[in-house]
Each structure stands twice: as C-alpha cells, then as structure tokens.
C-alpha cells in the first residue's frame, strides 16, 4: 500500500489518498472501509440522454470523478478488485448526485478515503505499507508421490499447484524425477523471491537436489524445513515454526498461527484464556487481557450494526489498548481465523487466570 497524501476533511475526519499495489492491499481496504465513509475516485458510469435527462439505464459510459458515501464494500478476491458501493455525494456532473453507484478499485488505482480512522484500522494500513517491502514467498511441500505449492499472502495462503501420482514401483507409478520436474517447473513459473521447501523424510532433500541441478536460478532462493506432512498440514507447520519470518521478517499469518495455538493450549489447560463476546468483554473490564484476538469479518459485521453480539466491540478494543494489551485482527481467509470463528469470533489470552 502506498499513502500518497494525508490531510483532514470536515468534522475532523482524516483524508488519506491511497494506492493499493497488490491484492493484499485491496483486502486490507475491505476491512478499513465502513458505511458512512467517503471515498473519492475516478470511475465510469453509463449515461443515456433521454429528453435532456440523464440516467444510468443504458447508453455510453463516461468517465467521472465521484465521491461516494459508502453503503457496502465487497472484496472480489478472484477478480482482484474491491467493489465500493454507495450514494454519489460529489461528482464532476451535478446531474448524477444522489444516484447509487459502484467504484471498482483495482491494483494501482488511486482513491481518497475520508473517515474517522479507528486505531486498529490505522495499524492495518501501516502494516500494509510496511509489507510492500517484504519479499514474495512460496511454500513448496513434498512427500512420496505428492507435491504442493502455496503462495503466502497477508490474508492467508493459497494453493498455487498440486501434483499427485504414485512414485516408485508398480504398474501405475512413475519415476520420482517426473514429480520433481513438475514441482520445479511450477516454482520457476511462479518466480517467487524466496521458496521454503518442506516435507517429511528424505523426499524433500531429493527434490532439492533435483531442482538445484535442473533449475539453477532457483537454487539460491530455497531454504528447507522439516515437517511431518505435505499439503495444508505441512504449510501450517511451516508457518507455526516461523520459517516464513526468517525470509519475510514477520507475516500476519505466521503470527496468527502461533497465537491460535497458544490460545487453544491455554483453553485446554483451563488457564489464562477466554472466548466468546460476553466473557471477553468481562475480562476487558478487569484489565486482564494481554492479547485480544478477533476475526476481521465478524469485527466488520459488528461495526456495521449487523451482528448479534450484546457487547460494543469498539469499547472492548479501546479498553484493551488503554490497558496496554495487544489487539490482533485475524484473517477469516486462513485456518487460524476459521478456528477463532468457531470460538465465537473473539477470544483473549489473559495476563492472569480469572475465577
């Protein structure tokens, strides 16, 4: 994320001109923008001339500069765009005021956001800005007969490629080198800045030997990690062990994987942890929260007034921060966020055990 300008609007609202530089940045914006915010940007709108009246039911598209009062925000993950919908409150054509419209924000599009930013939203934007300096990382996991490649995003990991077929002896088996060749070709095509090669046993080392010999450009980018499995389970082990941090300093998802493991361990011991909105709010009142964990999509729903929590989540967050606790907003796109959702969407690691 690049912040190209800062200022202030009416009623003390902060104005930030932002340029999302990748799909991660669009995802961050989806969790920063809320109903009532103002978003300015270039767009196109279908205009039809009909007795000198303008409407958007047909005709040619015209370029406009609009300010929307936001009603709804949607991160279209597979289209690599952010859809910001709302009412036009400012426009280069006055006849379009008060009409409903949607701005499609894509990578490298510039928009200006005017709103009262909450502390966790400011932190999210700062995180996105700092992450622009991190290298792209791929995790390749391999075991006998199977190999997988995952890309590491800030909102989670995504499977980029998978190759499964028995290797070794048998009528339907194939030479291991064929599997390693497919893996090497996928990694070369992905062209990540760093590759973590993981898996159980000696298969991982054999794959490394093959790839460094046949794909020499990849050799200096690969580090290896021992895991008990390949695929999603192996990826989780890589993240939990902090292997991604070694090449990317710190990533959101490796931090989340460690925190959710710490939380579930404390819960299993009946120790310093609590979960669910009411219990977490009570812990915040006692000043007992060391780290507050909340899922991004649930946080957004509650802030929009569409949730069913009986607590004010903003008050809980402010209370935790005022008492020196940390607040971590989990991605719902990744396994730790799913685990946290199953615990009610909000939980806390405590400074001390509550009776």
Swiss-Prot record:
Q: Which GO terms describe its cellular component?
A: cytoplasm
The prosthetic group or cofactor this protein requires is: a divalent metal cation
Any GO MF annotation of the entry: metal ion binding
Localization terms from the record: Cytoplasm
Any GO BP annotation = nuclear-transcribed mRNA catabolic process, no-go decay
Listed A to Z, the keywords are: Cytoplasm, Endonuclease, Hydrolase, Metal-binding, Nuclease
Q: Does the keyword Cytoplasm apply?
A: yes
Q: Which superkingdom? A: Archaea
Instruction: Let me see what the UniProt entry remarks about domains.
Output: The N-terminal domain has the RNA-binding Sm fold. It harbors the endoribonuclease activity.
Q: What is this protein called?
A: Protein pelota homolog
**Species annotation:** Halorubrum lacusprofundi (strain ATCC 49239 / DSM 5036 / JCM 8891 / ACAM 34)
Q: Taxonomy-wise, where does this protein's organism fall, top ranks first?
A: Archaea, Methanobacteriati, Methanobacteriota, Stenosarchaea group, Halobacteria
């Amino acid at each position: 994320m690049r912040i190209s300008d800062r200022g202030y609007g009416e009623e003390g609202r902060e104005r930030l001109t932002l340029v999302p530089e990748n799909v991660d940045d669009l995802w961050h914006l989806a969790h920063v923008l809320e109903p009532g915010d103002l978003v300015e940007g270039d767009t196109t709108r279908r205009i039809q001339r009909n007795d000198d009246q303008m409407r958007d039911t047909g005709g040619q598209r015209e370029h406009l500069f609009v300010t929307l009062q936001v009603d709804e925000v949607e991160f279209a993950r597979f289209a690599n765009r952010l859809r910001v919908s709302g009412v036009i409150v400012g426009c280069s054509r006055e006849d379009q005021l008060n009409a409903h419209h949607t701005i499609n924000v894509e990578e490298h599009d510039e928009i200006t956001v005017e709103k009262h930013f909450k502390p966790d939203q400011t932190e999210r934007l700062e995180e996105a800005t700092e992450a622009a300096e991190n290298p792209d990382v791929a995790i390749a996991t391999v075991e006998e007969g199977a190999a997988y490649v995952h890309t590491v995003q800030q909102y989670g990991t995504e499977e980029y490629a998978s190759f499964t077929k028995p290797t070794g002896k048998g009528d339907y088996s194939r030479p291991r080198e064929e599997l390693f060749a497919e893996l090497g070709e996928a990694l070369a095509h992905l062209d990540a800045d760093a590759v973590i090669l993981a898996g159980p046993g000696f298969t991982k080392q054999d794959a490394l030997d093959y790839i460094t010999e046949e794909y020499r450009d990849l050799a200096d980018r690969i580090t290896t990690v021992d895991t008990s499995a390949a695929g999603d389970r192996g990826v989780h082990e890589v993240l939990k062990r902090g292997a991604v941090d070694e090449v990317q300093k710190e990533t959101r998802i490796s931090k989340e994987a460690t925190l959710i493991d710490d939380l579930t361990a404390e819960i299993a011991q009946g120790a310093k942890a609590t979960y669910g909105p009411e219990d977490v709010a009570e812990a915040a009142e006692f000043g007992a929260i060391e780290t507050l964990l909340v899922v991004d999509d649930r946080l957004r729903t509650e802030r929009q007034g569409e949730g069913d929590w009986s607590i004010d989540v903003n008050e809980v967050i402010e209370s935790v921060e005022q008492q020196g606790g940390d607040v971590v907003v989990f991605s719902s796109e990744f396994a730790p966020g799913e685990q946290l959702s199953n615990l009610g969407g909000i939980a806390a690691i405590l400074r001390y055990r509550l009776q």
